[in-house]
Amino acid sequence: MARIAGVDLPQKKRIEYALTYIYGIGLTTSRKILDRTGIDYNTRVHELTDAQAATIRNDIQENVMVEGDLRKKVTLDIKALMDLGSYRGLRHRRGLPCRGQKTKTNARTRKGKRKTVGAA
């Protein structure tokens, strides 16, 4: 089983799609990695040689921020926005959408379960 960046990749999938199981790697990044390493998109994960898996591992380690490091960076970036007191930081702190969506009727995912107000 190919294990790259701490993630077990599905054996029967093509490598270009299997790499997207790693947090921080989408289809575009996956294709760029395969272009740099010279591996065909259509290769299945179980067909990869140890050398090819090692080149993919090295390329990801050198060029792409993935998994724990990326999650930590995103969390710290959001925390920095909140500490600055910017509008986006305030929206994060209040648990509301940050990107301009209306909140009068929607935004249930971000706001959570309804709280009944004024029920007698």
Curated annotation (Swiss-Prot):
Superkingdom of the organism of origin: Bacteria
GO annotations of cellular component type: cytosol; small ribosomal subunit
GO molecular function per UniProt: rRNA binding; structural constituent of ribosome; tRNA binding
Complex formation: Part of the 30S ribosomal subunit. Forms a loose heterodimer with protein S19. Forms two bridges to the 50S subunit in the 70S ribosome.
Similarity field: Belongs to the universal ribosomal protein uS13 family.
Pfam families in the cross-refs: Ribosomal_S13
The name this protein goes by in its record: Small ribosomal subunit protein uS13
Keywords associated with the record: Ribonucleoprotein, Ribosomal protein, RNA-binding, rRNA-binding, tRNA-binding
SUPFAM superfamilies in the cross-refs: S13-like H2TH domain
Function per UniProt: Located at the top of the head of the 30S subunit, it contacts several helices of the 16S rRNA. In the 70S ribosome it contacts the 23S rRNA (bridge B1a) and protein L5 of the 50S subunit (bridge B1b), connecting the 2 subunits; these bridges are implicated in subunit movement. Contacts the tRNAs in the A and P-sites.
Annotated region (Disordered), positions in chain: 93-120
Alphabetical GO biological process terms: translation
